[in-house]
């Protein structure tokens, strides 16, 4: 049951969703879905008491969207600022200097000294944006 503080189940499910997006772990997303299913009957009787679980359900219904901004930190700033002009509630945003560490970085190499931005859905990416203006156009 949620109130001003998220429930343990809700917080764990929401964290599992975010980490699942970052690490490409569908099993974590399935566990979050299972948690939401476990409280579905209670949720229908007391919607106001399950705010975090409602966030989980909305997140599960949203397309899996990722934004990878790759390049030297000083070159990424313009892309990060461009992304900040858009409402991206269920988008995992991952800035990085190199393509190491997370599955969403695989195959997305920096372009020399320049930054690139990849807009992806379920880890499938469009061609990279080479300018902040291109990124804004891709984000819609």
Feature-to-residue mapping (PLM):
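Glycan-recognition and catalytic cores of secretory/periplasmic carbohydrate-active enzymes
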Residues: 1-140
């Amino acid at each position: 049951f949620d109130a001003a503080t998220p429930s343990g189940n809700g917080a764990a499910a929401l964290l599992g969703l975010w980490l699942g997006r970052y690490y490409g772990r569908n099993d974590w997303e399935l566990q979050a879905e299972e948690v939401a299913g476990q409280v579905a009957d209670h949720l229908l009787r007391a919607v106001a008491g399950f705010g975090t679980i409602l966030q989980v359900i909305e997140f599960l219904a949203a397309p899996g969207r990722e934004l990878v901004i790759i390049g030297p930190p000083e070159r990424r700033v313009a892309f990060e600022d461009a992304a900040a002009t858009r409402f991206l509630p269920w988008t995992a945003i991952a800035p990085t200097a190199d393509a190491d560490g997370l599955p969403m970085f695989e195959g997305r190499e920096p372009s020399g000294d320049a930054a690139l931005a990849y807009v992806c859905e379920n880890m499938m990416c469009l061609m990279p944006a080479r300018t902040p203006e291109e990124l804004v156009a891709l984000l819609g």
